[in-house]
C-alpha cells in the first residue's frame, strides 16, 4: 500500500492511500547518493513575514465577554434581531479598536454556535468573563470606557446602516436603530452622529479621510456581519446594492470604483453581495488590483484574526512523486471540489461528512481547493485544523489566489505588470510556507493572452509550485482540458491544466462537457478510447446535489431529487470509468503529465529528492 507522510515538527504521520507500493523514506539510505538530494516532504519555507500578510492585524486583549443574541439578521423588534446584532457588532468593533489603540484590554466574542467557532473560541488566550446581552454589556465599566455615545441609523433607510458603520469608528460610538434609541439614552449614552438619512455615497464623501485604505468591507444592507471588523480597523464600509437582495433600486458601482482606486493595491475586500451576478462586483475588485474575499456570513473576525502573524502552524500533506508509478499506460482523471475560495463556507458546514470529512474522499482521491492565504490571516487556527484533518490521498490547492479574482483582468485598471508580480509573490509565500504545491486560478477566458501572462507571473514567483489548474468563470470547463506550459525561475517546465469536465446539476439537460456523474464518466471514457494518454481534470460543483441511481447509466436521472454532494457523486462517476482510466489526486495528475511531456527533465528532477 502506498503511504504519504506529513511532517509536522517532531511528528510524522503516515497513512495508506492507494494500492501502489510506498516505503517511508529513510534519510540514511540516501547519504551516499551521487546526486545530493533532500527529503521531498521538507521542501517548504519556514513561517516568516515576507510581505504576504495583507490583512490588517488585530491586537489581542487580556479578557473577553461573550455577547448572546448577536448573530441574527432578522429584521424584527425582538431581543435577538438585526437591531441587537448591530449594537453587538459595534461593541465588538469598538472594544477591539480600543485594544488596537492601547485604550483597553477587554474584547467581546459573539456567541456563534458552530463547532468551528467553539473550537476557535477555545484557542483564545484571554480570560473568559462570561456571557452577557448587549444591554448588560452597555452597563459594564470596561465596555463603557470604549464607547463615546451612539450613531443613529434607520432600518427603513437601508443604506444608513453602512454609513453608521463608518461613523461608528470615527465617533467611537455604537450603532443604534431609531427603535432602540430611547433605551440606549436611558443607559446614559448620547447621540454623537445622525446617520439615519445617510448613504454609502455620503459616508464616502464625508469620512474617507478618516478611514484606513488597507482593506474594505463590502456587505449587503440589512446585515450586521463584519461591521465589527470594519470598526476595529477604521475601514470604509459599503453596500453594492442600495436595497437588500435587489437591483431594482440601483447600486453603488460608481462609488465602489472610486473606493477601489483609493485602496492600497492588493488590499482584501471582505464580504459579498446578494441577488446579483457575482461577476458584476467581483470584476470591479479584480480590475482594480485588489482581492475579493468571499466572507459575508462571518462572526468574530477581529478575534479569530488577532495576532495572526505569530500564529502560523500546520502544513499540507503532499504526494511524493518519487513513489508514483510512472509505468502506467492508462489515462488519468482527477476530481477537485469547487468554491474553495469561499472563506465563510469554511466555518459554515464545510468540515463535515458532506464535504471535507466525506467517507468517499479516500476512494475518489478528490482534491480540495482551500483559501489557504486568507485563512492564514483571518482564521489561522481553523486552517491548522483543516490541514491536520486532511486525508493524505486528497491534494490541497490554494484556490483563487488570496481571494476571488480573475487572473486575466487582474489589475487591468492599474499597474498590471507590477501588481501581478507582487500578488504572485504574496500568494507564493503563503503557499511555500504551508507546503501547498498547486495553485487554482479563475479566469474569464483561460486561453487568452492575458491569462497566460498571469500564469507566467505566478509560476515565476514560486519555484515550489508543481502546477496550476485554471477554471473559467463560465463555463467552468470552458478550457476543454487544454494545457499550457511555462518555465519557472529554475527553467523547469510547469503545466497549467484547464478544467476538461464539470460534474454539475444542470436540471433537465447536460452541456457539452458539464453534467451528471454518469454523463461525465461517459465523456471521460470516450476520450480515453481515442488516446491512451489523456489527462482529465474534473471540477465537482460544490453546490450541485445528485441522487443515487445505482448501476443505471441514465445520463440525466441523477439530477432529480438530489441529496448527495462532493466526493459521493464523484465516486459514482469513478465507478463508471473503464479500466484504462486511473483516478489520481491532482498532484499525481500533474506529475504524470510532466513525466509524459518532459520525461528527461522530470526524471532528473526526481533525483534531487527522495
Protein language model features and the residues they cover:
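Positively charged n-region of N-terminal signal peptides that target proteins for export
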Residues: 1-4, 20
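Bacterial Sec-dependent N-terminal signal peptides
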Residues: 8, 14-29
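A recurrent domain-boundary module in secreted/ectodomain proteins
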Residues: 22-23, 291-316, 585-610
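Preference for solvent-exposed, low-hydrophobicity sequence contexts
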Residues: 26-307
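Catalytic grooves of carbohydrate-active enzymes
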Residues: 254-272, 338-365, 375, 431-434, ...
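Active-site beta->alpha N-cap acidic-glycine motif
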Residues: 301-386
